[in-house]
Amino acid sequence: MALNLQDKQAIVAEVSEVAKG
């Protein structure tokens, strides 16, 4: 399972926003 750097960044950003609420 390989993710592109952009995809990884996007996922991290989404998770961060969700975590913040």
Swiss-Prot record:
GO molecular function: rRNA binding
Keywords: Ribonucleoprotein, Ribosomal protein, RNA-binding, rRNA-binding
GO cellular component: ribonucleoprotein complex; ribosome
Keyword Phosphoprotein: no
Protein family: Belongs to the universal ribosomal protein uL10 family.
The protein's assembly and partners: Part of the ribosomal stalk of the 50S ribosomal subunit. The N-terminus interacts with L11 and the large rRNA to form the base of the stalk. The C-terminus forms an elongated spine to which L12 dimers bind in a sequential fashion forming a multimeric L10(L12)X complex.
Protein's job: Forms part of the ribosomal stalk, playing a central role in the interaction of the ribosome with GTP-bound translation factors.
Record's protein name: Large ribosomal subunit protein uL10
Species the sequence originates in: Proteus vulgaris
